[in-house]
Regions:
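Solvent-exposed N-terminal domain segments of exported/luminal and surface proteins
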Residues: 65, 69, 76-188
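N-terminal secretory signal peptides
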Residues: 1-22, 27-38, 46
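Extracellular/lumenal glycan-associated surfaces
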Residues: 177, 207-220, 263-274
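Extracellular glycan/ECM-engagement signal in secreted proteins
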Residues: 86-138, 224-357
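A mature extracytoplasmic/lumenal domain signature
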Residues: 154, 185-187, 215-219, 243-245, ...
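Active-site cradle of extracellular carbohydrate-active enzymes
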Residues: 199, 203, 208-240
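Short, low-complexity, disordered segments immediately C-terminal to signal peptides
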Residues: 40-69
Length: 365
């Protein structure tokens, strides 16, 4: 099924992703004790610690992932790839992100790629959520000192960090459309997708009204193709879709949802079963602070966290114009509405409950 992206920040209103929830329920997932990264950890959660992982503790030489992917991508398109073409790709961007160049900016800075975005996808959002915390998608300021950072030369770690025992908060990967990807399970050890907390694209909003995925955005493969990644883990290694970069059947994966490719470089895959995305950090990272990969951008809440709205199902989300949004939901056979306008400094809400009661709220950001 064809999936479209448009170079503007507001989503269009067509649904193009098949609902995998019914199929996944048949799979029987082994659920661990992860916390949903978008939610506050429970009291039983592992206390915040700081674990520094040295870049010298590696089991493989560092590799230039951009150069390797660029070579593979060019080879798939033409047998006449030149080294100068690959070098130009390395200097300009990371493969995959180039398909979203109008809304996602990538540039080299020292040993890292800096990635800037507003965190909102071009596809629609929120539709299909049946377990809703009353948070809504807002554009974020992932830029400048708050941009995403991906190592230019990732390396395998002697001591990988498993998402089953840590990384309970924050992102563990970044999709090539600029949307962060969080861990998969909520603070009750439940699969967030299977229990209805995610929309048809595998995302929802966190406490800061920040939209993010909790499963692999496999739908992006229809845009970038099999030869390019759909995301990158925060350790710098690429995440491909459900096939190998050459289009062949996906090979056996390790506990982190990855393996060494035919090019000799490690990469992850997105899957339709847990862990869906990278199952942790197989590569070297600078540290884990407060149960999240550090450093990474912050998304700070500007209002009190929402509470679960029992019996509500989100039925529609739209953006009639830039900076204006509307979310519709059904509850007990009636329709509720959240309309809001966003500027650089403020957010104004109008809430219409299923009973018809109207309230307004305004916040500074």
């Amino acid at each position: 099924m064809q999936f479209h992206e448009h170079p503007h920040e507001h989503p269009h209103h067509h649904e193009h992703v098949l609902d995998r929830r019914s199929a996944l329920r048949l799979g029987g997932l082994g659920l661990g004790g992860l916390l949903l990264a978008a939610c506050a950890p429970s009291k039983s959660a592992i206390s915040s610690t700081s674990t520094e992982l040295s870049a010298s503790t590696t089991t493989a030489a560092t590799v230039d992932v951009a150069s390797t992917i660029a070579s593979s991508t060019s080879a798939a398109a033409s047998q006449a790839t030149t080294s100068s073409t690959a070098a130009a790709t390395v200097l300009n961007t990371l493969p995959g992100f180039d398909e979203f160049a109008s809304t996602v900016k990538v540039f080299a800075s020292g040993d890292y790629w800096q990635v800037e975005s507003n965190g909102l996808p071009a596809h629609n959002m929120m539709v299909g959520i049946t377990s809703w915390q009353q948070q809504v998608p807002l554009p974020m300021t992932y830029k400048g000192s708050n941009a995403w950072q991906l190592p230019k030369q990732p390396a395998l770690a002697d001591n990988p960090v498993s998402a089953k025992t840590s990384l309970y908060r924050g992102a563990i990967a970044l999709a090539v459309n600029g949307v962060p990807i969080f861990n998969a399970l909520n603070n009750r050890g439940e699969d967030a997708f299977l229990v209805g907390e995610l929309d048809k694209w595998g995302g929802h909003c966190g406490r800061a009204d920040d939209y993010h995925y909790h499963v692999a955005p496999l739908h992006l493969a229809t845009i970038v193709g099999s030869a390019k990644p759909i995301a990158y883990a925060l350790d710098g290694f690429a995440i491909y879709g459900s096939t190998e970069p050459d289009g062949s059947t996906m090979k056996k994966l390790d506990a982190y949802n990855g393996h060494i490719g035919t090019d000799g470089v490690y990469h992850y895959h997105g899957t339709t079963t847990y862990p869906y995305i990278n199952g942790g950090m197989r590569g070297v990272i600078r540290g884990v602070v407060g149960d999240q990969v550090d450093p990474q951008p912050s998304a700070k809440p500007f209002r009190e966290a929402g509470a679960p709205l029992q019996g509500a199902t989100i039925t529609n989300f739209s953006s009639p114009k830039t900076g204006q949004y509307a979310l519709e939901y059904s509850q007990s056979g009636k329709t509720g509405l959240v309309e809001y306008t966003v500027s650089d400094t403020a957010v104004a809400f109008t809430f219409t409950s299923p009973t018809g009661a109207v309230t307004t709220e305004k916040y500074t950001r």
